[in-house]
């Protein structure tokens, strides 16, 4: 019934109730001038033409024409909330960052969950990795831990990221999602096997945002107060327990409630059922990194928990919904390069690429002064630097302080204790191909040891159900990769594909050689 709906459905009703004792505000233009009539446009007579002097109309339309800002190129569909992080265990022997300085310390945070490939209006229940980004408002500035709900990723080299995302989005001619593009890229880059296997497992469709884990995914460096450094990975374990959606339920919800994840999160917080996660770290010394059997900075691989156990750190609790979605969720900007002293990047190639890409896309989407937007502002510290001006500078622009450095007028100076950790680096400058690195050992362990028989069956069914729509030559390349992981893995998928291909023979296709010249149409079966 309309009188007993959930908090998200009753948002307008609750807003009115909260203002019950207040008189309605006076309607104004954007310039604050009172408006006498908002329902009828100004004309010459009841049937005459409009007048340019109707500033009520022009003010409204001019703003309406500019309401939309560029959509995020990835992670466009998302839900956000505000929270606090509380330290429960001492890790100061590893990290000097003040966010961890003593047990019981609380830090305000903002969190955004998202899908990756879909547009802003896409469904929350698609099979897709989920973004899990956390913004810590610390007294040493912003710390953005920008991760996913998976501990690994599809690629290990940042140069491939634009092509990878293009392959997951829409065909440039048809504007349709294209299984050929997706599986062609995945099959040509076997390092994607680990993430693809995770994606098509049960965890590929989480039950909303509250029932999934989060991971920093990358390898980071922690530095303690004595200048000693270790490598680190961050993990958020959901306190609500892991829950996933079946393929059938996900398909149903994508039609009945495409905003299922957003609604579920909003209602949980609105009713006081605050979701929480426990933060853990894994630690690896520099000496251990040198003897690690894989590249410890490879984003397509994990650190085994038996060798590098989880160390508890603290608790993240979501306890406030956004007051306004655009102001606090659409405009929030996460940047992996925002790191306070004590937290630094590792040589992880993907992380290194993101250090540039994320702030660059924010400057495009939100403007060069996006850090002045309230939700992005490092409000718990004083920003003092030599950056000035630019579009939409809405502060005092640091007044009359010098805008050059060095200077002789008591302007901001360096803090030597904030110097980065010194590390040794050597090698020949070059472009190093990592395609043939071990891409199967950890995937084999995932398939044979992590998954049970029923989970393996569903994994193979999910992969075959998606791969069947790709051309046969792409199917063959993909199956070969799965065979390399384990014969059972590849054989199961091939058996399912054989059935699909008999039921739905492939139609004629057109292919193009690399330089774009046209080839004659061929049957897919002959490729």
From Swiss-Prot:
Entry keyword set: Acetylation, Heme, Hydrogen peroxide, Iron, Metal-binding, Mitogen, NADP, Oxidoreductase, Peroxidase, Peroxisome, Phosphoprotein
Entry-linked PROSITE patterns: CATALASE_1, CATALASE_2, CATALASE_3
Annotated positions of the N6-acetyllysine modification: 233, 306, 480, 499
Region Disordered, residue ranges: 1-32
Residues given in the record as NADP(+) binding sites: 194, 201, 203, 213, 237, 303, 305-306
GO cellular component entries: mitochondrion; peroxisomal matrix; peroxisomal membrane
Gene Ontology biological process terms, A to Z: hydrogen peroxide catabolic process; positive regulation of cell division; response to hydrogen peroxide
Segments of skewed composition (Basic and acidic residues): 1-22
SMART domains from the UniProt entry: Catalase
Catalytic activity reported: 2 H2O2 = O2 + 2 H2O
Alphabetized Pfam families for the sequence: Catalase, Catalase-rel
Residues recorded as bearing N-acetylalanine in the entry: 2
Annotated active site: 75, 148
GO-annotated molecular function: catalase activity; heme binding; metal ion binding; trans-2-enoyl-CoA reductase (NADPH) activity
InterPro entries (alphabetical): Catalase (IPR018028), Catalase_3 (IPR040333), Catalase_AS (IPR024708), Catalase_clade1/3 (IPR024711), Catalase_core (IPR011614), Catalase_haem_BS (IPR002226), Catalase_immune_responsive (IPR010582), Catalase_sf (IPR020835)
Positions carrying N6-succinyllysine: 13, 221, 306, 480, 522
Quaternary context: Homotetramer. Interacts (via microbody targeting signal) with PEX5, monomeric form interacts with PEX5, leading to its translocation into peroxisomes.
Family listed: Belongs to the catalase family.
Listed name of the protein: Catalase
Organism: Cavia porcellus
Lineage start: Eukaryota, Metazoa, Chordata, Craniata, Vertebrata
């Amino acid at each position: 019934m309309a009188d007993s709906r959930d908090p998200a459905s009753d948002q307008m009703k609750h807003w009115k109730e909260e203002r019950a004792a207040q008189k309605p505000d006076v309607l104004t233009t954007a310039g604050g001038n009172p408006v006498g009539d908002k329902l009828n446009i100004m004309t010459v007579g009841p049937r005459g033409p409009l007048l340019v002097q109707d500033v009520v109309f022009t003010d409204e339309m001019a703003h309406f024409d500019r309401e939309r800002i560029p959509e995020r190129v990835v992670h466009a569909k998302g839900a956000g909330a505000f929270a606090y992080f509380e330290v429960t265990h001492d890790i100061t022997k590893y990290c000097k960052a003040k966010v961890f300085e003593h047990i019981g310390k609380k830090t305000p945070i903002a969190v955004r969950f998202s899908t990756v490939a879909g547009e802003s209006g896409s469904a929350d229940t698609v099979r897709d990795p989920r973004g899990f980004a956390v913004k810590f408002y610390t007294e040493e500035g912003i710390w953005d831990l920008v991760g996913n709900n998976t501990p690994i990723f599809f690629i290990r080299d940042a140069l491939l990221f634009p092509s990878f995302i293009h392959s997951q989005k829409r065909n440039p001619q048809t504007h349709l999602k294209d299984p050929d593009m997706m599986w062609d890229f995945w099959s040509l880059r076997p390092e994607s096997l680990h993430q693809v296997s995770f994606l098509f497992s049960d965890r590929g469709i989480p039950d909303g945002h509250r029932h999934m884990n989060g991971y920093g995914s990358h390898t980071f460096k922690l530095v303690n107060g004595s200048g000693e450094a270790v490598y680190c990975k961050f993990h958020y374990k959901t306190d609500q327990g892991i829950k996933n959606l079946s393929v059938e339920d996900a398909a149903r919800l994508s039609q009945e409630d495409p905003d299922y994840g957003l609604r579920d999160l909003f209602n949980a917080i609105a009713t006081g059922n605050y979701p929480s996660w426990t933060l853990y770290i894994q630690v690896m010394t520099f000496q251990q990194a040198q003897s690690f059997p894989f590249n410890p900075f490879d984003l397509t691989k994990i650190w085994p928990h038996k060798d590098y156990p989880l160390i508890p750190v603290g608790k993240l609790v979501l306890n406030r919904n956004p007051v306004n979605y655009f102001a606090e969720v659409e405009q929030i900007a996460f940047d992996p390069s925002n790191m306070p002293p004590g937290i630094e990047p590792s040589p992880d190639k993907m992380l290194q690429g993101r250090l540039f890409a994320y702030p660059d896309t924010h400057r495009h989407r939100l403007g060069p002064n996006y850090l002045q937007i309230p939700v992005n502002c490092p409000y718990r510290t004083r920003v003092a630097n030599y950056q000035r001006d630019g579009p939409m500078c809405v502060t005092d622009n640091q007044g009359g302080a010098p805008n050059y450095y060095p200077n002789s007028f008591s302007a901001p100076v360096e803090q030597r204790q904030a110097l980065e950790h010194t590390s040794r680096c050597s090698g020949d400058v070059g472009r190093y191909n990592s395609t043939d690195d071990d891409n199967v050992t950890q995937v084999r362990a995932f398939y044979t040891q992590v998954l049970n028989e029923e989970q393996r069956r569903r994994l193979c069914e999910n992969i075959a159900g998606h791969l069947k729509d790709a051309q046969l030559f792409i199917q063959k390349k993909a199956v070969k990769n799965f065979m390399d992981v384990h014969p059972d893995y590849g054989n199961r998928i091939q058996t399912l594909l054989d059935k699909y291909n008999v039921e739905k023979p492939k139609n004629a296709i057109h292919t193009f050689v690399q330089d774009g010249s046209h080839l004659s149409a061929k049957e897919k079966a002959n490729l």
